[in-house]
Amino acid sequence: MIDLRRYADREHLLLASYAMHSRDTRGRAHPEPPHAYRGPFARDRDRILHSSAFRRLSGKMQVFTGEMGIYHRTRLTHTFEVASIARTLARTLRLNEDLTEALALMHDVGHPPYGHCGEDVLGECMQDVGGFSHNGFALVIVQQLEQRYPQFNGLNLSYETLAGQDVRAHKAEASRGRSPMLEVQIVDAADSIAYDAHDVDDALQMGLLSIDELAQLAVVRRALDQIRARRGILPTQQLRQSLVHELIDLQVSDLLRVAIERLRSVEGRSTEEVSDAGLRLTHSDALAEERTELESFLFDAVYRHERLMAVRAAAALRLRTLFEKLNETPERMPLRFRQRAKELPIQMAVGEYLAGMTDAFCDQQYRQITETPVGPLADW
């Protein structure tokens, strides 16, 4: 049995003053006794990791192509990549690693099937009931839909973990001048870093782009220069893998340099005081400009590629059709969502049901409900 006072003492030694300390948690909606050897945020992390919604991320594509192959990234693999980068940032900056990991594991739990086009379709279909946001739906999942405990609905996560996700769900409503806690900021940064680097990787793997095309971008040229200086000329496959690693390392290193410098000014202050001061962890101006160039290029060359646009149009048709059919015949939904339809507007209950589906299950439901003998979208 571990004395939790020693756990708090260990945090006091390892974490910076501006990190979120376990001893300062505001607790849970449903009070629970402390765990024998895990702090509150470690428990949150484990509850998210073992949730049904988290496991379903393995069946949702990161960038929807219709091809669920061994290589392709899913929301689950992306989430683990984000968590890995976020933990590195947290450890280096002496922030709370358990809280950071919990936030990273939760950040994509609310994503619907079919990638971002799935979110766009649900947003349109649900506009009369407030639209759809995967960040907001993640909170619905962990507070209501997950049913793992007899005493309450949801996972009963700590206030800080829920508040961190709430910031992501309501960014436009965030009070000006006050910044999110630092653990939230580095998860956002890790998500963006992983997203850009791995979209480059996937685009190269699928043949949508070549390294020569990418080399016109400043941040890619810089990464390639670093690789050649250290390793010389590499075969194409090794060069692609090295490029992804170097893009991540460049961005992480830049963020840490800026963060370490800014955090010197708040040494000794609490997490609340740092938020009140509005301190934000960002990339340097130079790298931020290069990242904007990269993201703009990827948007035009990859996300709007005619091959992917055709698949997404088919996916959008399927999801929109399912939404309409289930609104007309909600009795086709499982019991718990039929019950939700009695408590909520029917569009919200249908949207929640669809948002929880994997890509393959959505295809299956489309075939069953429309009685259309179509194959997977990879065949389009």
Model feature map: region roles:
Residues 1-79, 83-89, 96-98, 118, ...:
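Histidine-centered, transition-metal-coordinating active-site segments
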Residues 69-77, 90-91, 106-113, 126-129:
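Short coil/turn segments at secondary-structure boundaries
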Residues 99-127, 135:
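Aspartate-rich (DDxxD/NDxxD/DxxxD) Mg2+/diphosphate-binding motifs
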